[in-house]
Amino acid sequence: MDRVAGQVNSRRGELLELAAAMFAERGLRATTVRDIADGAGILSGSLYHHFASTEEMVDELLRGFLDWLFARYRDIVDSTANPLERLQGLFMASFEAIEHHHAQVVIYQDEAQRLASQPRFSYIEDRNKQQRKMWVDVLNQGIEEGYFRPDLDVDLVYRFIRDTTWVSVRWYRPGGPLTAQQVGQQYLAIVLGGITKEGV
């Protein structure tokens, strides 16, 4: 019985991975159950054995990704000594997500605003608010403790970091000439060059 359950879970994971790649490449509205089933070499009805709809697949993909991301963020905030190191950790965790959860990041970037209006995806707006608070708190702490310039508009800096980081998923491809860590380190150097206090 456990072996059968393991095979079902493994197949479910394979189908989710395939669906994620298709959603990221084509968009949610342009990807049908039939497309995913064809890509998996199964009949559409067989896909319904695993998932009730494409929305269920998207929900599982986004929830899993956001749960992973926020666990990483929380670990960094809870275990890192100072605001500068916390900011660096959050920044690099975001690029880690782009490397290892590329399709989910693309889906999130392309579809989150539209999906957030649906009750099933109400958690997206909650996560956006949590993310903003986490980053803004770190920036404010950095100003208070003398790591970051006191004249910064924290909300503007947060928006810049968020948009600069996550939009890189548009051009960055895992397995290309640069790793996400290399890109993240370059981006981080640019950001820190603009926000850190002289002498830090």
PLM region spans:
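C-terminal peripheral helix-coil segments that are non-catalytic and often amphipathic
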Residues: 2, 93-96, 100, 132-145, ...
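Helix-turn-helix
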Residues: 3, 14, 18, 22-56, ...
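Hydrophobic alpha-helical connector segments
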Residues: 60, 74-104, 154, 158-161, ...
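Amphipathic alpha-helical segments used for helix-helix packing
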Residues: 99-119, 170
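Short coil/turn segments at alpha/beta junctions that flank glycine-rich nucleotide-binding fingerprints
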Residues: 25-29, 80, 101, 145, ...
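Hydrophobic/aromatic residues within well-ordered alpha-helical segments
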Residues: 11, 54, 61, 65, ...
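Amphipathic alpha-helical packing segments from all-alpha helical-bundle domains
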Residues: 67-70, 74, 100-103, 118-145, ...
